[in-house]
């Protein structure tokens, strides 16, 4: 993908996806409406009618943004959203890890399955273009520190957690639920083979 070509076709849902926040702004409510419909999150009789997008820096790869939207009709979709781009055109080091989102997108799409065994942020859209490593993920925004969700902890600061044992018990319990569901044959793991080279940032 040329640096100026900020839209690429998604491999899963067949919709052209924006590679960065500027392209998403250009796509505006029309893109979000079609994207949410294509992912099965938004009905054909509803639409995204307004959006506000604010980028922030976080994590080790790609770019992130907070997205606030409103809908034409009342619905159960969240309005406070999180956006993750696999690409970072301003930082080659962060852009190097762009292929990591391939499996993340597949997992996000899988979470839309009725009866998915663990609680995760609701996925409104996810797609990835393998040829360029360009991906887009739009989910419900986690409200840390409220409604039973732990506060946001910085990486590598487990010593500051009030209950690290309880934290990791919850993490491994969720992983066990996923593994058990997979082994029971209700979810396919064929799309989640591990390639450590693709998971490496540097």
Regions found by a protein language model. Give the residues of each.
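Conserved NTP-binding catalytic cores of kinases and kinase-like/nucleotidyltransferase enzymes
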Residues: 1-134
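Active-site catalytic-loop/activation-segment of kinase and kinase-like phosphoryl-transfer enzymes
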Residues: 6-21, 27, 180-202
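Non-catalytic, well-ordered alpha-helical scaffold segments
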Residues: 62, 136, 169-173
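Short regulatory "switch" loops immediately downstream of catalytic or recognition motifs
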Residues: 69-72, 144, 183-186
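Short acidic/His/Gly/Ser-rich catalytic and metal-binding motifs that mark active-site loops
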Residues: 90-92, 146-151
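Short pocket-lining segment of the protein kinase catalytic domain that shapes the ATP-binding cleft
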Residues: 137-146
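Conserved kinase catalytic-core helix
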Residues: 149-193
């Amino acid at each position: 993908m040329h640096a100026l070509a900020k839209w690429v076709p998604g491999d899963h849902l067949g919709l052209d996806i924006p590679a960065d926040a500027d392209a998403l702004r250009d796509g505006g409510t029309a893109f979000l409406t079609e994207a949410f419909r294509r992912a099965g999150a938004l009905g054909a009789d509803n639409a995204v009618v307004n959006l506000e997008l604010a980028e922030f820096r976080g994590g080790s790869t790609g770019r992130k943004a907070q997205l606030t939207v409103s809908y034409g009709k009342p619905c159960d979709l969240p309005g406070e959203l999180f956006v993750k781009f696999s690409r970072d055109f301003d930082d080659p080091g962060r852009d190097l890890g762009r292929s990591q989102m391939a499996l993340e997108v597949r997992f996000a799409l899988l979470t839309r399955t009725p009866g998915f065994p663990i609680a995760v942020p609701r996925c409104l859209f996810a797609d990835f273009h393998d040829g360029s490593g360009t991906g887009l993920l739009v989910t419900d925004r986690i409200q840390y520190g409220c409604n039973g969700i732990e506060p946001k902890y910085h990486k590598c600061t487990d010593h500051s957690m009030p209950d690290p044992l309880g934290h990791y018990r919850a993490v491994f319990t969720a992983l066990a639920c996923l593994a058990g569901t997979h082994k029971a044959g209700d979810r396919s793991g064929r799309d989640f083979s591990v390639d450590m080279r693709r998971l490496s940032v540097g």
